[in-house]
Regions:
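NAD(P)-binding Rossmann-fold cofactor-contacting core
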Residues: 149-170
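Hydrophobic/small residue at the entry helix of a nucleotide-binding pocket
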Residues: 136
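Extreme N-terminal basic, low-complexity initiation segments
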Residues: 2-12
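Phosphate-bearing ligand-interacting subdomains
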Residues: 62-67, 170-258
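Glycine-rich Rossmann-fold phosphate-binding loop(s) that bind the pyrophosphate
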Residues: 133
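HTH-adjacent hinge/linker in prokaryotic transcriptional regulators
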Residues: 73, 77, 82-127
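Extreme N-terminal segment that seeds HTH/winged-HTH DNA-binding domains in transcriptional regulators
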Residues: 15-72
Length: 258
């Protein structure tokens, strides 16, 4: 278990954790294909884009903040203005899944939040396994925000003998990677997070797939090969930094895609 972290390390862990939360919604959507589905959208749920899924996750966070402020209702316009979103896009995204607004009132914050959690598959606790007990894996394991959003970090896995049998600061146990298949089956792990070096990522993802996990969040650079029924989302921090670098260099022409 690592020692004390610097302020920069804490900030990095927080930013990585935010990226983790932002991407999990699409993985939950993939998991729902083989399990219990949320309320049916007006069209085939398999055709919902990843950008739409990500926006629903953003709306959910905004509603959570509004609820904490004591708000009971909100219009798409006020939601957009307060959180720097697009009102027309909000209405379009929500209309895809049904009619949630009330004429003259807008949206009931608590009800819309509940519907979004159902749509995103977050109305039940999901168990997550982290592969790789290095600094990144440990930082993710100890982030308390995951549990608040319904994601339980069930275990970590590593192949270094000195780490096996240890725990993260928050008490997440570290198991031998050889026990992955047995643990996934016994503890119903739904999502795997890869926090391993790029050189071993494909070998590790093969083990994860063989264990029966259908949703994977990959923090290793590069592209992984998986079967068609397995969803992988990559979080490449270097790409994000390069995008910010482009914005700084060309701020007058840089535009957000979504």
């Amino acid at each position: 278990v690592p020692g004390r972290e610097s302020g920069a390390e804490v900030a990095m862990a927080r930013d990585i954790s935010m990226a983790f939360c932002y991407n999990l919604a699409a993985l939950v959507k993939q998991r729902n294909k083989a399990g219990v589905r949320p309320p049916k959208p007006r069209q085939n749920a398999d055709h919902v884009s990843e950008l739409t899924t990500n926006r629903l996750s953003v709306y959910l966070r905004c509603l959570t903040e509004l609820e904490a402020q004591g708000a009971r209702t909100v219009s798409s316009q006020s939601l957009a203005e307060q959180f720097h979103l697009n009102a027309a896009q909000i209405r379009k995204d929500l209309a895809y899944f049904g009619e949630f607004g009330v004429r003259g009132v807008g949206y009931y914050v608590r009800d819309l939040k509940r519907h979004l959690r159902q749509i995103l598959g977050l109305d039940r606790r999901l168990r997550v396994g982290i592969i790789g007990a290095g600094n990144l894996g440990l930082a993710l394991a100890d982030y308390q925000g995951f549990r608040q959003e319904g994601f339980e970090i069930a275990a970590m896995f590593d192949n270094q003998v000195g780490k096996v049998g240890q725990q993260s600061r928050s008490g997440v146990p570290i198991y031998d990677i050889a026990e992955l298949r047995k643990f996934v089956k016994r503890d119903a792990v739904s999502i795997a997070v890869l926090a391993v070096p790029a050189g071993s990522a494909q070998k590790v993802v093969d083990m994860v797939v063989a264990a029966g996990v259908k949703a994977i969040l990959n923090f290793s650079p590069g592209t992984l090969q998986v079967p068609d029924d397995v969803k992988v989302k990559g979080v490449d921090l270097t790409v994000s930094l390069e995008s910010l670098s482009f914005y700084l260099a060309h701020g007058d022409i840089a535009q957000d895609d979504d």
